[in-house]
């Protein structure tokens, strides 16, 4: 994550503290077997600039990244779109970049998902991981989960499985290795 995920509303009230956001992120990461790494940029203040690109470059170099999953660069959330755009720049030498829609709001651009992953056997884990973000879940309500279930079900119907995640492919180099 690029930000500390603290969320402050329009009147300055903290809706989700850094501590709470980190704890929720840790719980979600544990559910899916991932490690959570957080940046310190402020939520709603991320901009597409060289500072963000260099942050991502350092991350890519430090962790020897060869596959990137990033926010869709046309997401209406300003942080998400800035991160998506900056990732295209920072990931220019990475052989595989996939973008995803991370929220349920609409935009004037079409998401062009063409790479499907069957998540039928892990959909319950996805739901648990989303619900682990308790402050977001409380704010959005049960409709948030229903949206993801319906979207993943619709994606699955397109390819003949129960649930699927779909990504927009920026580039995807398949690497075939010779057997020794």
Question: Predicted segments — roles?
Answer:
Residues 10-12, 48-50, 80-81, 109-111, ...:
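Short, well-ordered secondary-structure micro-motifs
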Residues 18-21, 78, 120:
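Active-site metal-coordination segments of metallo-dependent hydrolases
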Residues 1-64, 92-93, 169:
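Active-site rim/loop-helix segments in enzyme catalytic domains that contact anionic ligands
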Residues 27-32, 67, 94, 102-180:
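The feature marks non-catalytic terminal segments
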Residues 56-103:
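Active-site adenylate/phosphate-handling loop in enzymes that bind or generate adenylated species
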Residues 16, 84-88, 116:
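Glycine-rich, phosphate-binding/catalytic loops in enzymes
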Residues 24-27, 51-58, 82, 86, ...:
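Alpha-helical elements of Rossmann-like donor-binding domains used by nucleotide-donor carbohydrate transfer enzymes
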Residues 5-9, 44, 74-80, 105-107:
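Active-site environment of divalent metal-dependent phosphoester hydrolases
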């Amino acid at each position: 994550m690029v930000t500390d995920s603290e969320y402050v509303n329009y009147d300055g009230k903290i809706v989700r503290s850094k501590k709470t956001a980190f704890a929720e992120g840790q719980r979600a990461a544990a559910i899916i077997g991932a490690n959570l790494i957080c940046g310190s940029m402020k939520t709603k203040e991320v901009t597409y600039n060289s500072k963000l690109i260099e942050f991502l470059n350092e991350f890519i170099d430090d962790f020897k990244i060869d596959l990137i999953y990033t926010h869709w660069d046309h997401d209406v959330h300003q942080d998400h779109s800035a991160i998506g755009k900056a990732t295209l720049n920072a990931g220019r030498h990475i052989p595989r970049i996939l973008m995803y829609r991370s929220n349920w709001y609409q935009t004037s651009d079409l998401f062009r998902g063409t790479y499907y992953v069957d998540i039928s056997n892990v959909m319950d884990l996805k739901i648990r991981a989303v619900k682990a973000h308790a402050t977001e879940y409380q704010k959005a309500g049960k409709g948030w989960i229903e949206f993801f279930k319906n979207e993943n079900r619709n994606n699955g119907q397109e390819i003949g499985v129960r649930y699927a995640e779909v990504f927009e492919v920026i580039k995807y180099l398949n690497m075939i290795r010779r057997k020794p």
